[in-house]
Amino acid sequence: MDKLVIQGGVPLHGEISVSGAKNAALPILCAGLLTDGPLTLDNVPQLQDIATMRKLLLHMGVKIAELGAHCLRLDASDVHTCEAPYDMVKTMRASILVLGPLLARFGHARVSLPGGCAIGSRPVDLHIKGLQAMGAEIHIDHGYIEAKAAKLKGARVFMDIVTVTGTENLMMAATLADGLTILENAAKEPEVVDLAECLVKMGAKIEGAGTDVITVTGVASLHAASHDVVCDRIEAGTYMVATAMTGGEVRLSNARADLLDAVIDKLRESGAEVECSDNSIIVRSKGVVEHPGTLKSVSIRTAPHPAFPTDMQAQFMALNTVADTVATVTETIFENRFMHVQEMQRLGANIEVEGNTAIVRGREFLEGATVMATDLRASASLVLAALVARGETVIERIYHLDRGYERLEEKLRQLGARIQRIK
C-alpha cells in the first residue's frame, strides 16, 4: 500500500493549477444518464472516485470516450441496466447520485446503499422522501434501494437538513418530471450551482441554484451539451493553508476566490496575505518554518455554504497546531469528523476534544512520526502538519488522498516541498 514520506521545514514557492472539483464532476457525470445525446465534459480531475464512477456508468452501458487527459464524452443512448451493484459503490457515497437520473429517464432503479468516508451516518432518507413526494415507489431490500415510477411528478419538497447530494439528486430527477418542482432548504454549494449550469445547457429549466429555494420546471427530454467542471475550491483552500503554514509565496491558477470567502477571511485572520484576481489567487506568508510564532490562531465553526466549509476543518486544525495561542474548531455538519486528532497528537499537537468542539493549543513546532490517514480531508491535514514538522513524517493509507486530490505530491514538489510516494 502506498505511503507518503515528507521531510518538513521547507517554505513553499511557485505556481500550480487547481484541478476540477471532484464534488462537481461526480454529479455531472451522473447527469449524463438524463439524455441520449452526448455530454462532453472538460476539466474533469483524474481521481479514484472519478474512476469508480466511470466504472459504474460503463457497467450500465454508458459509452465514455477520453478526448484528453481531463476531457470526457459520455453517451448514454444505450443504457442496458439501471442497477448500481454493491461491489461498485461500496467505496463511494456519491454513487447514490445515479438514483434520480435513472428513475427520471427510465422509470426504475436499483441502487446499493453507498459507502465512502467513514465520517458519520450521512443518511440517504432525504433523497428517498423527496423522490417519494414526486410519486416514486421506493423500498429498501437487502441493502438496495428499489425505486420505480411510471413518470415523476413535480412537487414541493422541503429538506429538513441541508443536503448537497440530496439537492443534486432531486434537482436532476425534477428536470424530466411532469410540472414544477420546488426544492426548499436546498444546498447552496458552488458544486450544486455548477451542476445546475450543466443541466441548463442540456435544456433543463432551473432557477434559484445557489439560493435555498430551487425551482425546476420539467421538460420532455434533455439534449447534448458541453460543460467545463468548476475548479476545486477545497483543493485550492488546502494549498492556501499549506502556504500560510510553511511560509513563502504561491500562486494558484484556475482558482476562484469568490467560492472561498470564508476560507480567505480566516487565512487573513491568521496573518497570511491573500491577493485575488479573476482566475487566480496568490498567498504570501512568513510561516512557521522560518518565523515561529508568527501564525495567529483562528477559531472556526463549520456550517453549510456560504459559511465555513466542513471540508476545510481538518486543514485549519493543522494550522492551529502551530499557531500562537488557543483556538476552537467546532464541527456542526458531520459527526466522527475529528478522527485526525489522534494522528496529529502523534506529531506532538496539543488538541482536546469536547463533544463537537476541538480545543487546539498552538505550539512552536511539531515532530515527524508515522501516522495513518483515516479519511480524505484528515489525510490532507496530516500532509500539512508534516510540511512544518521537524524531521520525517510517514503517512500511511494514502488511498484516501487519491480519492480527492489529483497528483498532490507532484504539485507540492513543484512548490519545493520534500515529499515522495513510496510503494
Curated annotation (Swiss-Prot):
What reaction does this enzyme carry out catalytically? phosphoenolpyruvate + UDP-N-acetyl-alpha-D-glucosamine = UDP-N-acetyl-3-O-(1-carboxyvinyl)-alpha-D-glucosamine + phosphate
This enzyme's EC code(s): 2.5.1.7
- Keyword entries, A-Z: Cell cycle, Cell division, Cell shape, Cell wall biogenesis/degradation, Cytoplasm, Peptidoglycan synthesis, Pyruvate, Transferase
Identify which residues the record assigns to the active site: 117
Q: In which pathway does it act?
A: Cell wall biogenesis; peptidoglycan biosynthesis
- Entry's localization field: Cytoplasm
List, alphabetically, the SUPFAM superfamilies matched. EPT/RTPC-like
Q: Which Pfam families match?
A: EPSP_synthase
GO molecular-function term, one example from the UniProt record: UDP-N-acetylglucosamine 1-carboxyvinyltransferase activity
Q: InterPro entries of this UniProt entry?
A: Enolpyruvate_Tfrase_dom, Enolpyruvate_Tfrase_sf, MurA_subfamily, RNA3'P_cycl/enolpyr_Trfase_a/b, UDP_GlcNAc_COvinyl_MurA
Q: What family classification does the UniProt entry report for this protein?
A: Belongs to the EPSP synthase family. MurA subfamily.
Under NCBIfam families, the record lists: murA, PRK09369.1
Please identify the protein, giving its name as recorded.
UDP-N-acetylglucosamine 1-carboxyvinyltransferase
